[in-house]
Amino acid sequence: AAEYFQTVLTCSEIGAGKDEPEIYLQAAQALGCKPEETLVFEDAFHAACTAREAGFPVIGVYDESNRRFIHQMQEQCICYCDQMEECIEFLNANGIYRE
């Protein structure tokens, strides 16, 4: 994960699940960024909704266990990807990330 992300936090470290925005808010704080400046990568629909409602742009990542929520994820997220390479292509195309 360190190859792609500056900070990685877990729900157990924070003491709250992804149905609460605390993990996302603490991640933004750790990065020294505002929510609207912090990309959230999520594979769970409920978590994507939580992050979006807290003001974060969300990139949806496919996960087999959440397949039934693909259309909802596509509506909630600024981008929805089957693989990390697709996410990187989206970020490059939008000037958000450069390899």
Placement of each model-derived feature along the sequence:
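Asp-based, Mg2+/Mn2+-dependent phosphohydrolase catalytic module
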Residues: A1-E99
